[in-house]
């Protein structure tokens, strides 16, 4: 694995754990950990963009609302699927 990809993974893992509210820290970090090993570089970039939305927007995304505000539908589908299992 190249160092750029590993740096991006580390950044995502850190950001997923330290969001703001404890509930979202737990939810987002579990979501990220469940998918991160299977993502290519492009998907990692999309995931990084997704988790940089505020908690309220991420909750709406996980409920299938406001999905037009995020371009990567595959990552959104993974978030919704994870929420439905969680």
In which residue ranges do the predicted regions lie?
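Positively charged, polar, low-complexity stretches
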Residues: 2-86
């Amino acid at each position: 694995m190249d160092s750029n990809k590993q740096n991006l993974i580390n950044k995502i893992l850190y950001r997923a754990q330290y969001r703001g509210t404890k509930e979202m820290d737990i939810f987002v970090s579990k979501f990220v950990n469940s998918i991160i090993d299977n993502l290519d570089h492009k998907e990692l970039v999309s995931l990084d963009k997704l988790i940089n939305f505020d908690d309220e927007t991420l909750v709406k995304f996980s409920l299938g609302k406001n999905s037009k505000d995020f371009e990567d539908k595959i990552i959104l589908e993974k978030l919704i699927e994870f929420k439905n299992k969680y």
